[in-house]
């Protein structure tokens, strides 16, 4: 249930930078989005002047972008709101190689797979950046300039400008060299390809700023150095911090899995719940990075966290805003309505969007049953009770509900009162929920 293109454009038009800051650079600093950069004074002056062209790259090493990429997309959008023109680079060539991981060699994906993922990422990038006005986003693919290059031309025209000693000092390369696995020439050459990207965008479109994660700093500066050597030009780079949770756990993971921007991989319901579960110690920092709320509103929410943390107002606002950004306002509204109905806080389960409710139940303990299976058995199958005898006692004590109605008969078939889509919501006590998907022939 994503928004239509017109509604998505309305959402983009409603976004704005905080007018309490004189310069977008100051706002980026306040939001905690600058970890490392080239000359800060020069960057601040550059961003306060005439519009510039800038870019960020996204490699198609998976079928979808994830929350780490969202940091870059929203940073790009803030610069666009300040009048600067974004170029979204989807790495059709660099995605065939993959940047070196500190631990092990990447598995190379098939060219056909990478080409398919390029299309998926292009669509995702365009959701977050405006295609209207003089500074409309433009998408580029680095395969367009690397594919025509012969190996000899690549080595003569680009490779000769890179010093091996400097390349060996890059963090990921150094880590791999000190490991048992080592590093292949394929991955070692990645930083040259990314440097070439910046050079081409500098030549073709006048790009003078590249943004990316701070873990990519060596690759970012390979481009600024290449531009200096080849063109005698001056270009900049900004590295955003790698976000971690206050308890030291890795940000952007849910049950050990990445939180993806594609609803087929991470449902809007799962996205909403991920943000709703943000710790009090982290929520204000997340609001700064992942929403367009202005400083006065974030400071108000910070006071609310300190004075009335049990209300979780900041978490609810964070979950609403990010889910709306990623999946659209309609999907966010459907998720909230389904959550309220699921947990008995209002709303009729039968009136909820079927796909949203199904995705919510898949996040809970659930089972697939035939229509004739007894509710008592479904309680055991979903883990709400450990045995049939415990299930019968729970029903006899009035402690079990199905679709928010108290269950009177433990032997009643699950197929007797289904929601649209063949679903049953079981509840034991006030808060323990499970789902049953009823199918013929199971």
Swiss-Prot record:
GO terms for cellular component: cytosol. Disulfide bonds: none annotated. Pfam families: SYY_C-terminal, tRNA-synt_1b. One of its GO terms (biological process) is tyrosyl-tRNA aminoacylation. It is an enzyme of class 6 (ligase). ATP binds at residue 253. A motif ('HIGH' region) lies at residues 60-69. It comes from the Bacteria. Its EC number is 6.1.1.1. PROSITE patterns: AA_TRNA_LIGASE_I, S4. A motif ('KMSKS' region) lies at residues 250-254. The keyword Manganese does not apply. Belongs to the class-I aminoacyl-tRNA synthetase family. TyrS type 1 subfamily. NCBIfam families: tyrS. Catalyzes the attachment of tyrosine to tRNA(Tyr) in a two-step reaction: tyrosine is first activated by ATP to form Tyr-AMP and then transferred to the acceptor end of tRNA(Tyr). Homodimer. This is Tyrosine--tRNA ligase. It comes from Leifsonia xyli subsp. xyli (strain CTCB07). The lineage of its organism: Bacteria, Bacillati, Actinomycetota, Actinomycetes, Micrococcales. The gene is tyrS.
């Amino acid at each position: 249930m994503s928004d239509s293109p017109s509604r998505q454009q309305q959402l983009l038009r409603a976004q704005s930078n905080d007018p309490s800051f004189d310069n977008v650079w100051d706002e980026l600093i306040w939001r905690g989005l600058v970890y490392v950069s080239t000359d800060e004074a020069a960057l601040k002056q550059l961003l306060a002047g005439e519009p510039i062209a800038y870019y960020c790259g996204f490699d198609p090493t998976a079928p979808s972008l994830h929350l780490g990429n969202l940091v870059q997309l929203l940073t790009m959008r803030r610069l666009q709101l300040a009048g600067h023109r974004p170029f979204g680079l989807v790495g059709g060539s660099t995605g065939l190689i993959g940047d070196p991981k500190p631990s092990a060699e990447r598995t190379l994906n098939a060219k056909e797979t990478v080409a398919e993922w390029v299309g998926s990422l292009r669509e995702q990038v365009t959701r977050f950046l405006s295609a209207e006005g003089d500074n409309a986003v433009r998408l580029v693919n680095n395969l367009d300039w690397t594919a025509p290059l012969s190996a000899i031309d690549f080595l003569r025209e680009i490779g000769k400008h890179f010093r091996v000693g400097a390349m060996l000092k890059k963090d990921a390369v150094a880590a791999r060299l000190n490991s048992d696995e080592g590093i292949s020439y394929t991955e070692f050459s990645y930083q040259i390809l990314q440097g070439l990207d910046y050079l081409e965008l500098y030549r073709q479109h006048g790009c003078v700023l590249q943004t990316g994660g701070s873990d990519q700093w060596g690759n970012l500066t390979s481009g600024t150095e290449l531009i200096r050597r080849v063109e005698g030009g001056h270009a900049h780079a900004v590295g955003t911090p790698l976000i971690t949770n206050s308890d030291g756990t890795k940000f952007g993971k849910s049950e050990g899995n990445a939180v993806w921007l594609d609803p087929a991989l991470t449902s809007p319901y799962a996205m909403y719940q991920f943000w709703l579960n943000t710790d009090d110690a982290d929520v204000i920092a997340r609001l700064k990075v992942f929403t367009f709320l202005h400083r006065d509103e974030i400071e108000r929410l910070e006071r609310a966290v300190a004075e009335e943390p049990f209300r979780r107002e900041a978490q609810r606002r964070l979950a609403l805003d990010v889910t709306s950004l990623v999946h659209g306002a309609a999907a966010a509204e459907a998720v909230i309505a389904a959550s309220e109905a699921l947990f008995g806080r209002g709303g009729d389960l039968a009136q909820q969007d079927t796909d949203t409710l199904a995705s919510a139940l898949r996040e809970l303990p659930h089972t697939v049953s035939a229509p004739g299976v007894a509710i008592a058995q479904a309680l055991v199958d979903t883990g709400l009770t450990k045995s049939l005898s415990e299930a019968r006692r729970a029903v006899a004590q009035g402690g079990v509900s199905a679709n928010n109605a108290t269950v009177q008969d433990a032997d009643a078939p699950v197929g007797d009162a289904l929601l649209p889509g063949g679903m049953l919501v079981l509840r034991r006590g006030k808060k323990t929920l499970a789902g049953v998907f009823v199918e013929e022939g199971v």
